[in-house]
């Protein structure tokens, strides 16, 4: 999108949600544009062919020209984006802006009016790519309007290629999965369908999974085990010789606030307002899923963070640490 938004925990106050502004997306990782090499140049050239092929499938006669302009546009955007090295500094991507400041920052696009129109009622946003936003008017202007329309049209189709038709799906697979990531064959359709459903209603699947493989008793036993480990670790911190007393105090405080989630959420996701239809196409149902998810985002604006939520489903074979919440999560699988 030209300008998008999302609701996440405020980096400077993890108990409160904040509205974060996103910006133009790139068809390739920013490193491809920012770091010159033969392999990156080859990837950009193949990407341009891919973009042209999408436009051709959409019936555009001047597809090659549109693709060339879009890639040049993305190159210019990438020059202003944070590098991977800069992105490691969280302070560089934390730039709070009031609506008044945002209006002065970007003049050609009325972002405060846009946010209000789409239901986002906030008096402050956090901008990640502030360097790019300072130059937004160079990209969003009347001269670029045809290019912006093509850019948005392309991104709408390309981001849904796997859910539209076979030709688009094959194009997307051949470029992103096969060329960029080395995957030689598409996964079987049943596995792709399972992944899609898991992504949409993952906790509904998770509830079935834990009923069969991870009963409440198993969760209780794991929570008890983790509590013992925390107590043991606290004793270890107290006895180490290479830490100062002040450092030990901070470490013990962090450990005392350290949260562990095991198995599955105490409160399951509520899908009752997700309206799907057996008579609708896959894409039509996915639009309904998007509308449901959009409303969930709107509901978080201005509210405290719900720290009972999980970022993984119980059936996921993985684990994660969330530094903002100081929590570690072990799904049942």
What is the role of each PLM region?
Residues 76, 105-108, 126-130, 173, ...:
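Intrinsically disordered, low-complexity linker/terminal regions across diverse proteins
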């Amino acid at each position: 999108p030209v300008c998008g938004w999302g609701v996440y925990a405020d980096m400077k106050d993890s108990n409160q949600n904040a509205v974060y502004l996103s910006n133009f997306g790139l068809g390739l990782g920013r490193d491809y544009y920012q770091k010159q090499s033969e392999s990156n140049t080859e990837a950009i050239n193949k990407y341009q062919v891919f973009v042209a092929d999408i436009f051709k499938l959409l019936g555009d006669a001047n597809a090659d020209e549109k693709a060339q302009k879009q890639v040049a546009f993305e190159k210019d955007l990438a020059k202003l984006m944070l590098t991977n090295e800069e992105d490691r500094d969280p302070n560089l991507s934390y730039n709070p802006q009031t609506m008044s400041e945002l209006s002065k920052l970007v003049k050609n696009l009325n972002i405060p009016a846009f946010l209000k129109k789409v239901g986002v009622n906030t008096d402050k946003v956090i901008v990640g790519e502030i360097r790019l936003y300072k130059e937004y008017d160079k990209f969003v202007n009347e001269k670029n309007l045809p290019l912006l329309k093509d850019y948005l049209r392309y991104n709408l189709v390309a981001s849904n290629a796997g859910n539209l038709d076979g030709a688009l799906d094959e194009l997307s697979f051949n470029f992103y999965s096969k060329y960029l990531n080395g995957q030689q064959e598409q996964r079987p359709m049943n596995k792709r369908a399972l992944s899609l459903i898991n992504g949409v209603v993952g906790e509904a699947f998770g509830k079935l999974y834990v009923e069969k493989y991870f009963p409440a008793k198993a969760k209780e036993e794991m929570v008890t085990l983790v509590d013992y480990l925390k107590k043991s670790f606290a004793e270890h911190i107290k006895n180490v010789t290479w830490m100062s007393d002040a450092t030990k105090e901070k470490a013990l405080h962090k450990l005392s606030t350290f949260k562990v989630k095991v198995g599955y959420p105490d409160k399951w996701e509520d899908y009752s307002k997700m309206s799907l239809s057996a008579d609708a196409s896959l894409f039509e149902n996915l639009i309904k899923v998007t509308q449901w998810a959009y409303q969930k985002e709107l509901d978080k604006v201005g509210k405290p963070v719900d720290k009972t939520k999980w970022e993984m489903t119980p059936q996921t074979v993985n684990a994660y640490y969330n530094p903002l919440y100081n929590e570690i999560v072990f799904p049942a699988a």
